[in-house]
């Protein structure tokens, strides 16, 4: 949902403050840098733990949804129909790109520390999606840095027009890899039925696919058969998108049905278990999550997550919230934590494995 909110917010800001952004670009850069530093401090300090309102408010910044929305307008500006919006965005492409890059760096630094720690350690428990997303992120940071630096007028003048244009063609690779990165981040939770991820992924898919088709059409120009080729591509893409969306909807419904059925069928009772400390693991968003459950006098005394590969601070919210909820309810029939669905479900599945162990 933050993707949709961010796109609307950027649209309003560009329409309302285009003159101020152009005139006071340096102020925008400085403000973006301050916001990035604040995001890093908030994420590293864990200040959002236990405060749902703050998490929701800061999510567009901590998740880079807002900076991605800015890049989306920069990307789509060249293929928009001539009009007021295109005129305003085209006049601000450099300023918007630099601002988005600064904001994105805050996101990269905030979450990059955990990525690097896990990548430098044992990768055996990390999912393929996590490894690919991490590798793509590194390439994106490099491309983004090059494009942002060359967007400054002083650098552009020294490079020369031809060289600058060749470098700026890297933007196409940047946009393509951005969609790949978003897919690896959003698809796992979207396919598990998390509605905000479904909405964001469908929205990004429509935007990036539309841009790609319009960009190809513009590149072909008035060549013979160009319109027919683009029309055919649009038709094929539309059919593919409908089929993919239908599959996602069916998968989402099936996942929801399985969760509902599993919840109804649960007969996991700690009262039937002997006292002791039990261990189990389950697949999280990025890899294996391991935990221990302490049983005493027929009650769950503690649920302790001893290791996971999921992204903080989101995973920490699930570890704190779901673990406490299970202890409080003495059951695994508890709600997942918003924005940490995969980690929440992994905790629940691992505890269920323990409670379903046969007792002598």
UniProtKB/Swiss-Prot annotation:
TM annotation in the entry: 26-48, 58-80, 89-111, 126-148, 169-191, 195-214, 227-249
Membrane topology according to the record: Multi-pass membrane protein
Subcellular location: Cell membrane
GO cellular component, one term: plasma membrane
Pfam hit, one: Ferric_reduct
Highest taxon, organism lineage: Bacteria
Principal subcellular localization: membrane
Keyword list, A-Z: Cell membrane, Membrane, Transmembrane, Transmembrane helix
Keyword Transmembrane helix applies: yes
InterPro entries the UniProt entry points to: Fe3_Rdtase_TM_dom (IPR013130), FMN-bd (IPR007329)
Name of the protein this chain belongs to: Uncharacterized protein TP_0572
Native source species: Treponema pallidum (strain Nichols)
